[in-house]
């Protein structure tokens, strides 16, 4: 497995080609207004609608083996992986490097998915349903991991790699510490690699990533402060490297009402001010609002830098959100949830 690279691109990078490709790909995204219509469809109707979109190839190919919600889940993840691989294929030099560094989050997703599957005794075929080979770890390698007999066997497969230290946190009782360590590893590697390029493109991506870290930490604070978890434990779960890391760390363990009042005035406050109340029952609506804010932030940055990595990043996060929304709708319908409950968990930017 390759070690972390730190290239220093010395020449101006031409982003016209990759941003042009992304503009064309963006036109194929599902319009936001379609989500409301999908909420009023049954699962077979949703599948038929998706056959008329960029998901047609995957729906048709997988229909012989799956049906219903399972078909849609497989098809959307397969399409997501294909789309991200296409971005890597049509990019070169700095754009390709930055895209790959960002997409390494899917390596983390896949490792977590395999560990969880082994922890709960899932079969390798069940685990592979949720694998998205969109990062550096390829399908064959991931299938090999899914076939391992135990969590320890999976961990052993990463000896000598950047993942080894994070995976060593596994205590045999819970996956929480190792998952937290993997998340921190991703952002540490990301900041080190992207910051190491010393390029304008790397700097722009780093600016977004710092905001992403802040939003992830904010969601963690909402969940843990709402649950009354003590400050030291909350702080252990926060990811370093955000622009607001020190300020958010000081909010760990605060009484929930005080914590919410302390958020007023921050850039993200307007996105959540009407739902971040002291009597909040569920954090899911706040999480959806914050993720939508992050997408808008990515696109707003790209407006100032149209020939940069940012339009590509905006597309990447929007595409991921599209797949997540489709899956939430389908899972919710399969579980018989009311539309209102499904809708509040969806991210619409």
From Swiss-Prot:
Source species: Methanothrix thermoacetophila (strain DSM 6194 / JCM 14653 / NBRC 101360 / PT) (Methanosaeta thermophila)
Keywords: ATP synthesis, Cell membrane, Hydrogen ion transport, Ion transport, Membrane, Transport
Gene Ontology CC terms: plasma membrane; proton-transporting V-type ATPase, V0 domain
Gene that this sequence comes from: atpC
Protein name (database record): A-type ATP synthase subunit C
A molecular function GO annotation: proton-transporting ATPase activity, rotational mechanism
Function: Component of the A-type ATP synthase that produces ATP from ADP in the presence of a proton gradient across the membrane.
Classification via InterPro entries: ATPase_csu/dsu_sf (IPR036079), ATPase_V0-cplx_csu (IPR014272), ATPase_V0-cplx_csu/dsu (IPR002843), V-ATPase_V0D/AC39_subunit (IPR050873), V-type_ATPase_csu/dsu (IPR035067), V-type_ATPase_csu/dsu_dom_3 (IPR044911)
Localization of this protein: Cell membrane
Membrane topology summary: Peripheral membrane protein
Subunit structure: Has multiple subunits with at least A(3), B(3), C, D, E, F, H, I and proteolipid K(x).
GO annotation, biological process: proton motive force-driven plasma membrane ATP synthesis
Major localisation: membrane
Lineage top rank: taxon: Archaea
Similarity comment text for this entry: Belongs to the V-ATPase V0D/AC39 subunit family.
SUPFAM superfamilies: V-type ATP synthase subunit C
